[in-house]
Amino acid sequence: MNDVKSCLLVGVGGQGAILISKIMSNGFMKAGYDVKQSEVHGMAQRGGSVSTQVRWGKKVYGPVFGKGEADIMVALEKMEAVRYAEFLNPNGVAVINDYAIKSTTIASGAEAYPEGCIEAMQKNFKTIAVPASDIAIELGNPKCMNVMLFGAMCDSLGCPEIDWEQVVAETVPAKVKELNLKAFRAGREAAKAAK
């Protein structure tokens, strides 16, 4: 518990990065860690980039970290993984939703969606890529993709003393608790299959 660990959550507005950061923060605080978190919303309401930083350890002095300092990056959209790759340390783990959201310029044909996002990450970092959006749709609600991806990254946190399933159950709204627990479990299984 002496070392401070850092996680960067990135995605597009509305994908649920902030809920993941709340789940993480709740779990770490219950386990006795000092936790700090920071959110950058940008143009989130217009489909813009969103990033959240979560840091935990015995004593954390600030919520923000710089380039090359994230131990884990969770990307809810694969192009966002590449966009924020410079924040991941060389020994870090990238957990990526194998899903593309096309911006207005890409949808209009003015730009092309970049090819090989996941492959680019795999060349430089330990990478766990899972089809979180597809699995969430199979579970009945695409909005649970974020919790599914959280399940996929859970083992990378290195905190086996935390009952993350219980933390998810206590953090998500009651009306979607069972769906999110299914998503969490599916994420853990998908990560095992992706390794």
Feature names for model-found ranges:
Residues 1-195:
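Active-site cofactor/cluster-binding pocket
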